[in-house]
């Protein structure tokens, strides 16, 4: 591993690897629920949850918002350029070690600065990638996924694959080409496409059909290139309805699935579902997970939460136990996430500016999902919801209901049946009772 030059530049000295101490512990630098070696349903917690640290929020975010400049106290920010990139890399793996996470993720521009030309930018990346491979080899930490930042630079003002300018489309293709090469080089288990500016602000100047066709063509090119170079990781689309554009083409899970199926991409892509993006789309986290799951396209998760009182992507660390429990319920029903994981696409609050806050935040999120895993497993084992659902839809298991389910009925048959059975008796959905049961399981764990 590269020689350490950061020992005196941050406040993590003296902090050991975060350990599981149980729910009675008062130590803020200890896990209360997350016990990586604990076996649940035949798998360890570590294997179930597959936690990942997001490079951008953890290493590059400075706390800047629309109303104020950065607040984060990060010693490595005294560097600039490639020196800054190298310093961030070293601290990143120190943090991964303290948290004992198996994975991390990044955008290309998180890990190395953009140069004056594409060639210079790629040279910067190559320098960092060589060092990163050393850290990965020495630590055993793996790359969950990488992606291309095609939303920050002014060239992407009108989008990337959906830009009205062919030169921008070409540049974006070159950037993703390098990204897929990076994924292969680092053995990334997935590669993510998040279309930050793949959408529009007004239809008055937008050829939507052309832009959708171009985006599909771009993704097919990516599939072809991955095959060409032998990259076998899972491609992921990350839905989001808005921000920074007014309307993004991958608005939610259902919209993204329709797009993938329309353009024959659904055999090559799955979805990376983010909790806060579900909130922005007017859905619950578990709704988006369910939609992806029942279509066989749930690939990975960006673990965070939004603030329903605010209209933007707040990317808070996940602490809502209802949300983490219902999320893990869907993930367990999915048979896990395969090559995916729980990536903390989350940032500490602007007022949580000390370096230790990064540890507190990740501990909170990891504990919340560990708790959710335990409760969700018990709910499934006890068939708390499954038996209710089976009973609720029992009329489709016999008689006319079975004929409907098996495709044997038609309007003539159903009209005849309705005329003979004029009395319909519905039953209560018992929503409040089920919520009380959920509370009971949360309190008992």
Swiss-Prot record:
The active site is at 107, 110. Gene3D superfamilies: Divalent-metal-dependent TIM barrel enzymes. Its cofactor is Mg(2+). Its EC number is 5.3.1.5. Keywords: Carbohydrate metabolism, Cytoplasm, Isomerase, Magnesium, Metal-binding, Xylose metabolism. One of its GO terms (biological process) is D-xylose metabolic process. It catalyses: alpha-D-xylose = alpha-D-xylulofuranose. It holds the Pfam family AP_endonuc_2. Binds 2 magnesium ions per subunit. Mg(2+) 2 binds at residues 274, 277, 313, 315. One of its GO terms (cellular component) is cytoplasm. PANTHER family: PTHR48408, XYLOSE ISOMERASE. Belongs to the xylose isomerase family. This is Xylose isomerase. It comes from Bacillus pumilus (strain SAFR-032). The gene is xylA.
């Amino acid at each position: 591993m590269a020689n350490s030059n950061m020992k005196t530049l941050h406040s993590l000295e003296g902090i050991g690897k975060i350990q599981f101490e149980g729910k009675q512990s008062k130590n803020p630098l200890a896990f209360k629920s997350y016990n990586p070696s604990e076996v649940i349903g035949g798998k360890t917690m570590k294997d179930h949850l597959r936690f990942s640290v997001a490079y951008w929020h953890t290493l590059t975010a400075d706390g800047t918002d629309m109303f104020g400049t950065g607040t984060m106290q990060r010693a490595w920010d005294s560097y600039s350029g490639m020196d800054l990139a190298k310093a961030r890399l070293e601290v990143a793996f120190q943090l991964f070690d303290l948290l004992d996470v198996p994975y991390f993720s990044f955008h290309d521009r998180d890990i190395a600065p953009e140069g004056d030309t594409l060639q210079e930018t790629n040279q910067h990346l190559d320098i960092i990638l060589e060092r990163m491979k050393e850290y990965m080899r020495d630590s055993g930490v793996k790359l969950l996924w990488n992606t291309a930042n095609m939303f920050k630079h002014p060239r992407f003002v009108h989008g990337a694959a959906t830009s009205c300018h062919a030169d921008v489309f070409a540049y974006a293709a070159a950037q993703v080409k390098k990204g897929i090469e990076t994924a292969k080089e680092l053995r990334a288990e997935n590669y993510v496409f998040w279309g930050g500016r793949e959408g529009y602000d007004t239809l008055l100047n937008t050829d939507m059909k052309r832009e959708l066709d171009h985006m599909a063509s771009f993704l097919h090119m990516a599939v072809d290139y991955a095959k060409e170079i032998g990259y076998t990781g899972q491609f992921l689309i990350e839905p989001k309805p808005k921000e920074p554009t007014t309307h993004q083409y991958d608005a939610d899970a259902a919209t993204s699935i329709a797009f993938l199926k329309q353009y024959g991409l659904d055999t090559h892509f799955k979805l990376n579902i983010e909790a806060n993006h579900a909130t922005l789309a007017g859905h619950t986290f578990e709704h988006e997970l369910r939609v992806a799951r029942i279509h066989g396209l749930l690939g990975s998760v960006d673990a965070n939460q939004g603030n329903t009182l605010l209209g933007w992507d707040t990317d808070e660390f996940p602490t809502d136990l209802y949300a983490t429990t219902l999320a893990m319920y869907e993930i367990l029903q999915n048979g896990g996430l395969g090559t995916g994981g729980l990536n903390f696409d989350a940032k500490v609050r602007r007022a949580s500016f000390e370096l230790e806050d990064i540890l507190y935040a990740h501990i909170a999120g990891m504990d919340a999902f560990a708790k959710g895993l335990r409760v969700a497993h018990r709910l499934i084992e006890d068939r708390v919801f499954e038996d209710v659902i089976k009973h609720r839809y029992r009329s489709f298991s016999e008689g006319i209901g079975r004929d409907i389910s098996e495709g044997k009925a038609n309007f003539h048959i159903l009209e005849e049946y309705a005329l003979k059975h004029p009395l319909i008796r519905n039953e209560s959905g018992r929503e409040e009772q089920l919520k009380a049961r959920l509370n009971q399981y949360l309190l008992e764990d």
